[in-house]
């Protein structure tokens, strides 16, 4: 049970940070570090359907 649980858990942990890091970096580079700004950027992106770089 232990090895089985550890295996998937370790894999997930590795994937999660990688994905989070990439998103954080993109958000930081595209716009200022702000929760609201990030939300706005996503909303605009969805509305226009084209990548917007601010």
UniProtKB/Swiss-Prot annotation:
Please name the taxonomic classification of the source: Eukaryota, Amoebozoa, Evosea, Eumycetozoa, Dictyostelia
**Which stretches of sequence are listed as region Disordered?**
1-38
Q: Which domain of life is it from?
A: Eukaryota
- Regions of biased composition (Low complexity) lie at 17-38
Protein name listed in UniProt = Uncharacterized protein DDB_G0280279
